[in-house]
Regions:
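P-loop (Walker A) phosphate-binding loop of NTP-binding proteins
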Residues: 3
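Conserved substrate/cofactor phosphate-moiety recognition/catalytic segment
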Residues: 13-58
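C-terminal accessory "lid"/substrate-recognition subdomains
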Residues: 162-184
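Conserved lysine of the Walker
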Residues: 8
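Glycine-rich phosphate-binding loop used to anchor ATP phosphates in small-molecule kinases
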Residues: 47-94, 100
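Conserved phosphate-donor/acceptor-positioning beta-strand/loop module used by diverse small-molecule
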Residues: 91-111, 144
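Small-molecule kinase domains that catalyze NTP-dependent phosphoryl transfer to phosphate-bearing small molecules
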Residues: 113-156, 165
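Conserved nucleotide-binding/hydrolysis micro-motifs of P-loop NTPases
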Residues: 29-30, 79-81, 102-106, 149
Length: 184
């Protein structure tokens, strides 16, 4: 999760390959009219996001076990507000959000270097204003700084996910509502 240009899709692709889990870019789940708005430089409103969040949650809730016996899926999506994350949690079940945090100047630079993406760099300010950074009460969120190489970011994400899962185990070794590595 994070604003556009923070590296969500790149990290999700790397995690998918490393963990053997299916990955979906949340951009693919937007309704056509929402894509048209963003392409025109118009920020989305909550009403535009509800169907998109429902599609994300549905994808996660219906992820199946892969041939290696792992269940879960990875979705790259912004999930900027607590209410958006709560909607995904309520519909998809236990999830882990990876919050990609970085300086606006770095993110804007990345966005300006992208080719063929409908999200314009001019919408970054709107996303930063909308962003509700996760609080300490959101225990299913792992914060990661984007001020590092992609390979280091991927390695740090995996290390923190493993630690998160280990922390989710009860003392007798049984899983206590630990996610099946559903990542956003």
């Amino acid at each position: 999760m994070g604003v556009s240009g923070s590296g969500k899709s790149t990290l999700a692709e790397g995690l998918s390959a490393a963990l053997g889990l299916p990955m979906k870019d949340g951009d693919e789940l937007h309704l056509p009219e929402s894509v048209a708005k963003m392409s025109a430089g118009i920020a989305l409103e909550d009403a535009d996001r509800w169907p998109w969040l429902d599609r994300i949650a549905n994808y996660l809730a219906n992820s199946e076990q892969n041939p290696q016996g792992k269940s879960g899926a990875i979705v790259a999506c912004s999930a900027l507000k607590l209410i958006y994350r709560d909607r995904i949690r309520q519909q998809a079940g236990p999830v882990v959000f990876l919050f990609l945090d970085g300086q606006p100047d770095l993110i804007k630079q990345r966005m300006q270097g992208r080719k063929g993406h409908y999200m314009q760099a001019g919408l970054l300010d709107s996303q930063l204003q909308t962003l509700e950074k996760p609080g300490a009460d959101e225990r299913d969120i792992i914060a990661l700084s984007i001020n590092q190489s992609v390979s280091n970011l991927l390695q740090n994400a995996i290390v923190k996910l493993v630690a998160y899962q280990e922390d989710s185990l009860s003392h007798d070794g049984s899983l206590v509502q630990a996610p099946s590595l559903n990542k956003h």
